[in-house]
Regions:
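Non-catalytic substrate-recognition and accessory regions of acyl/acetyltransferase enzymes
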Residues: 1-183
């Protein structure tokens, strides 16, 4: 059974790894006390092909499971799949908080001028897309403008660009006010 190692009082204790112009945060989020699997939130900023000079990066995040010997168990790109492992709703909230904190660490370290992100799984339900909006809020809070831009073959695309000042948008206001879904 999954045991979350993140507590409400914990600050994100993770180092930003940097190499080949990529920035990575790998945060331990828990373990399975029956089979020994360890679970990490893996968050990466990688330069878009041909755009390194412009400081435009792609952001991706997932949950990765591995055995202590290093053998790979699985990678979960969205909540519809990770829910089978991380069952407790409170644990899921803590993990999402760790992902957002890791995104903030990467933005602070890389200082990208532009960021692009897309859903990994096509046709995600509204509840799953709201998590991307939560990650989007990290960008907005750090001085980026943007949000969801288009829908392509079931994938939602997001684009952000650094602006001179932090947005005055209320945290409760939808990022795309003209979108009836609010996301």
């Amino acid at each position: 059974m999954f045991r979350c190692t993140i507590t409400d009082e914990d600050a994100l204790d993770a180092d930003v790894l940097q190499g080949n112009d990529e920035y990575i945060v790998n945060v331990n989020i828990g373990f399975d006390d029956e089979v020994g699997t360890v679970y990490n939130a893996f968050v990466v900023l990688a330069p878009r092909p041909g755009m390194l000079d412009l400081r435009v990066f792609d952001l991706a995040f997932s949950i990765v499971g591995a055995q202590p010997d290093g053998s790979h168990i699985g990678t979960w790109w969205d909540g519809s799949r990770s829910r089978a492992v991380i069952v407790d709703p409170e644990d899921r909230i803590r993990v999402m908080g760790a992902v957002c904190a890791a995104v903030g660490c990467l933005i602070d370290a890389a200082e990208p001028l532009g960021i692009k992100m897309q859903t990994h799984t096509a046709d995600l339900p509204l509840k799953a897309r709201v998590k991307y909006e939560r990650v989007s809020r990290v960008f907005i809070d750090r001085g980026y403008a943007g949000g969801k831009t288009e829908h392509y073959h079931g994938l939602w695309l997001y684009e952000f660009e650094r602006v001179a000042t932090v947005s005055n948008v209320s945290p409760d206001e939808p990022l795309n006010a003209d979108d009836p879904e609010g996301i």
